[in-house]
Every structure is written in C-alpha cells, then in structure tokens.
Amino acid sequence: MPALLSNIDPDGLLEFSVVYTDRALNHMSKRFQGVMQDISAILKDVYAAHSVALVPGSGTFGMEAVARQFAHGQKVMVIRNGWFSFRWTQIFDMGAIPKQSIVLKARQQSTDTKSAWAPCSIEEVEAQIAAEKPAVVFAPHVETSAGMILSDAYLTRVSAAVHKVGGLLVLDCIASGAMWVDMKSTGVDILISAPQKGWSGSPCCAMVMLSERARQAIDTTQSSSFACDLKKWLQIMEAYEAGTHMYHTTMPTDALAQLRDVMQETQAYGFAKVKQEQLELGQQVRTLLESRGFKSVAAEGFQAPGVVVSYTQDAEIHNSKKFLALGLQTAAGVPLQCDEPKDFMTFRIGLFGLEKLHNPGRSVQHLAHALDEMGYLPIAAKEPAMA
C-alpha cells in the first residue's frame, strides 16, 4: 500500500516501523537508499575519496569520531591555526584520547600586534614529524577563526612527511567552502566536511572521507564511542552502497535528502566553476575590506577565499552588532589560542553558499553598503590603516 504522504516518499510504504512517522523519510526505504548512494558517489568524485561515512550530528561529531577511532593511546600532532583547530585539543582532553599531543601553532609575522598570521612553516612541520613520528597529524584546511587556508602544496608536503613515518594525515575541511581538496593528489588520508558551508545544505551530519590507506587502517582500530563509532558508520554507508540498509542510530533522513539535492545541483553546475567563483568572491571581499582600512588576520599566501577575518578596534564590529543593525548576520571574532596578544580583536565574514557564489556583485555590494552606513568609507592610503 502507498504511503499516506506522497510529498515525503512518493513510492514509500505505509509507515508502521518503530523508527519514524508518516512525516519522515524511512531509512529502510528505496528512496533513502538512493539518497545515500548519491551522496557517497558525489563525495568520492569531488574529493577523490576511496570510502565515505556519514556521522549524524555536525562537523565536530566527525572530528570526535575520527579522534576516537584513530588517536586512542597514540602520539599525535596538531597544526593549530586558530580556535577551531584548538578544538582537536579540546576533544583529546575531554576524552583523554591520545597518550601525547604535540601542537604546532600559527605565528604572527612581526612584533606589531596587528600584523598578519601564518601557519607553522612547512619546513618546521616536516622536521617535527620526522623527529616525533606521530601516528596521526591533524590539520585545518581552512581555519575559521583566522581566515587562513593551507595550500595544496603545503598539504602534499605534510602528507609525505607523515607517510614517511607510517602515520595518517587528517584534514578538517568543514569550513573549506568550495575549495575542494583532491585526496589522491595531496595525500590526505582522512578528510572531514559538513553540509552547511561548502555544500549549501542544512547541518545534520559530518562527512568523513577515507583514502584507500585509511580504509585499510580502520579495520585494525576500535572506537571509544558508541554513537560516534566511525567504523560502524562506514559499515552503514557500505551497506547502502551494496543496495541494502543497516541501522546503528537514527539518521537525519529528510535533511540528508535535501543535502543530496543541493549536492546534485552543485555537481550539475560544475565543481570547478563553483570553486572559481569562491576564489573570485573571496578576493573581491578582501579587496573591499582592505580598501576600507581593515587588515587581514591571515598573511599573504594563506588567505582563505571562503572566510575573511579582519582586525578591528571597534567593539561593535567585533561582536557583530553594527552589522546586525543593518540586517547582516556576520560572526563575532574569537581567540586563536596561538599566544595572540591581549588586545587581539577581529570580526569574521563567511562567504559560503551558492546564492553568494553565483551572485558575487550582489554579495560584495551588500557588504559595501553596510560599511558605507557604518562610516567606513574608501581610503586613499596605499597600505590599509587600522579600522
């Protein structure tokens, strides 16, 4: 017999399972099996991944799932470029996960308290990996507290150093936007993403992509979590890929169906095209902010196109109140946890989503109008002054 509500699942069954109601997509349905297969195929395509797992929750759930699967009792290393790579340390400490954690912090480029920041030099990272021989290295592709990105060349050298000592490289791509990372060419072993930024979806899960090397390694590991058991969620996805289904905990089926739809929309538009849009929009917004006197927190060569973080001395820009008053939801500045000076004060602008990327002129104009209204007009100075 057909489902009562055709808008949920036109080809669905009458709902009498013990998991869902008629108003939700059943995880055992043919429609949801197709959703999972489509998501997996697209993720494997764009990231050149070998395997995919979806962990219900948010990107941080994926971070913790990876840590509890691969880092228990191990010596690990974290490339910390700000507050959201400090999150690895918070996860480790809360769960008493690794036996030792070595942190390589981003550094300011001069003694000027408003100078730009860059990640630990790749030469130092390589030397530390060779000396310490960590089992796992954790790095942020884009650090949202600093607007800092690690280049493919940087990542490739990190992965080569990690592999030389037999370790794995984990890359947090939750805030990467449309700056897709090719796991095969960069050597990334485990890549973590989420729906709500680069994929223009609603938050509902973490996407964890594994290389062939990591897929082999996970079979020798045991998670210290039940709900965030990454190996179990990998098995769930592999069951869907095989044309069947499996249950661990209840999945956000309707949100995943919506995610699949927007992933297919992005795929049809073109991953390379949307990446170029991300690059161009980021450059335009950075140029705008510098023209109004706002210095970038991230140094040249490390400036992310999807997250722009700038210095300010205005407390109501820092806490986003001035933007809110003009109808814009920006993000307040946060600490870096990288030994920054006491007067460190920033604000953050996110440039995520197809609506912004497909309409760069409109996106920039919204920000320019807000800055005009605040009184931050274009300046003639060659070098940006402090705002």
Label each region the model flagged.
Residues 184-196, 206:
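Conserved active-site segment immediately N-terminal to the catalytic lysine
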Residues 61, 71-135:
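PLP-dependent aminotransferase-like
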Residues 290-362:
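Conserved C-terminal alpha-helix-loop-beta "cap" of PLP-dependent enzymes
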Residues 17-62, 86-87, 91:
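Conserved N-terminal alpha-helix of the aminotransferase class I/II PLP-enzyme fold
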Residues 111-177, 190:
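Active-site phosphate-binding strand-loop segment of PLP-dependent enzymes
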Residues 196-291, 355:
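Active-site C-terminal subdomain of aminotransferase-like
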Residues 2, 341-387:
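PLP-dependent enzyme catalytic core of the Aspartate aminotransferase-like
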